[in-house]
Amino acid sequence: MFLNGTFHELKGSAFDKPMKQEFINFFARKNNFSLFYIKVDNSRLKDTFCSNTSRVFNYLLKISMDYFIRNNYIPSENHILQLDERNERTESRFFLEDYLNTELCITGINQGNFEVSYFDSANNSNIQIADVFSNILYSHLKTGNYADELDTLRDNGILKYIFEFPL
């Protein structure tokens, strides 16, 4: 979180439990956004499926967005996705945006368009916040110690859904 003694960026892995609890309590009071997780059980995936991480990432994003829209968790409208540039391969910079627009918009599942942008997480507070929330679920799956915190997010209407893959 700090570089040469100055604040650099939020990193969920640098938060201890009290910091994560304070983070959750802060956002639970705000209740001005919705949180959706995509949880993947890697042990149930075939090696051939996982051989291209960009393809897996794009596919999981597509099927989860499809699910969220079809089940009215998110509206069928324009969507702006801000992603960590670590999820981008130079040769496929616009592939995800084209893929989502083809699979979800042209087919009529989504009535708007998808716009995908990639950022250095150090320069994007939304990605940093998402990183902390992601680490909270990851920590819970590893330790089982964050059930109360996840319940707080649910009870305050922030945590809307955890999409699990494979189904």
Residue ranges and their predicted role:
Residues M1-L167:
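Phosphate-ester processing/binding pockets and catalytic centers
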